[in-house]
Amino acid sequence: MTTKKLYFLSISIIILVAISIAIHITLNSNTKTRLTNDSQQQIDTIIEHDLQKGHIPGASILIVKNGKVFLNKGYGYQDVDKKVKASPTTKYEIASNTKAFTGLAILKLAQEGRLNLNDAVSKHVPHFKMNYNGQNETITIKQLLAQTSGIPSDITSEDAVTNKNNRLNDVTRAIMGDELHHKPGEEFEYSNMNYDLLGLIIQNVTKQSYTQYITDHWLKPLQMKHTTFKQTNYKSKHDAIGYELQGSTPVVSKPEFNLWDTPSAYMMTSTEDLEHWIKFQLNPPDKYKSLVQQSHKNLSSTIGEPNANPYASGWFTNNDEHLVFHSGTLDNFSSFILLNPKQNYGIVVLANLNSEYVPKLVEHLNTQIVNHKRYSTVASILNQYKDQFNIVTVLMTTLILLAFIFSAYRAWQMRHGQILLRRSKRIAVLSWLTLCLCIAIALILYALPYLILGSNNWSFVLTWLPIEIKLALITTLIALFSTLIVILLFLHTKITKT
């Protein structure tokens, strides 16, 4: 009996290792460099999975790579009640992704000599004054850009500020003399007021309203013809309706908002228009190249916030992965823009719900793009063997049933006194070895996505695997552990002599 058990264990290990080696060899063979139809299907599956998990009514998603649009598509509904589907022309409130436009505008004005980044804010906003430890402190434009001014993140949360002051000048007057959280330039603290003040500086320097300046000098030249700024809660034909979750149900939401927050939060745009913005960021014309590169450079370290990334001019950065990105959240909208200038691609996700699944979706799409050769190869190979995987599922299901029948029969025998328990050091050692084998198999299976595909987990991989492969994997896993249970029963029981 021991020989048979060891033989079965050896065969199980050999099969598992052989499968892993075969997949590994396949993945390291030559692959096509272009994104295939399988990749498109994988991306659709990933997107639909994350939108469903987040209960997101609608989203528009843009992927630009090497100057070409790989994906620009709507998912779900921009208006659930009227059954209006989301599309590339659907306009969303992009929240804090407005800041990159404000930051770039400030850098352009500095390049033109109309202001200096080291200028005191009070030079361009004469009435502006704030204190630290009771003493007046000078805040510079650069510190506003870097989010190191010391202005509290919650400075505009009081009703006295948010409800009664709806213009940039008014709100800056309302906070005059307030206390800073930190001495300017010393610590990072994210605050919308930093970029609202930059918007006011743009107005005072250019003698135009913030919205008009951005429209004339950035939106029109970039052919972002349909991009606007929020003025009311009225929704036009192409505007997405915003939603908030009640339980797991999205309900229409029209929260109050403040016009003075426009430079930091209230641009309204679509993936169709943002296509021009992303291409500009990744491959700017020569006359703008140094300006765009400057806007991506770190201005501050976010040491004040654990696990945060450095901040540039309206962008967070991740130097290790060469990423430039920013999220945007309102009560009823969320957005995320990610750029990888080194590998020349960008991802945009706009959604009509504030959801943690928006950044998760961007992370999944980013991983998909970085590893698309491997994913395309895996998908194309697995799809060729769907019938074989169905056979595996049937065989594994049969094995599971046999293991269940044997275990049930062994339990019946034990209840009727037909078998005895074995106790010996040798049995204990074999049991521990079996348990260790069980744990080893579990760890190998858990780590397979990382070992084969790189920096992924099963929950992500399962979103794009075909159902035939999922069933084969699940039944194989259950069959392996069922077999281990049978082995343990063989080791620990013996039939009594009659």
UniProtKB/Swiss-Prot annotation:
Summary of the function given for this chain in its UniProt record: Its precise function is unknown. Has no penicillin-binding activity and is not involved in methicillin resistance.
Membrane-crossing segments per the record: 6-26, 389-409, 433-453, 471-491
Protein name, as recorded: Protein flp
Record membrane topology: Multi-pass membrane protein
Record-linked InterPro entries: Bact_CellWall_Synth/Modif, Beta-lactam-related, Beta-lactam/transpept-like
SUPFAM superfamilies: beta-lactamase/transpeptidase-like
Pfam families: Beta-lactamase
Note: Has two of three conserved motifs typically found in penicillin-binding proteins (PBPs) and beta-lactamases, but no penicillin-binding activity has been detected.
Keyword 4Fe-4S among UniProt keywords: no
Protein source organism: Staphylococcus aureus (strain MW2)
Subcellular location: Cell membrane
Cellular component, GO annotation: plasma membrane
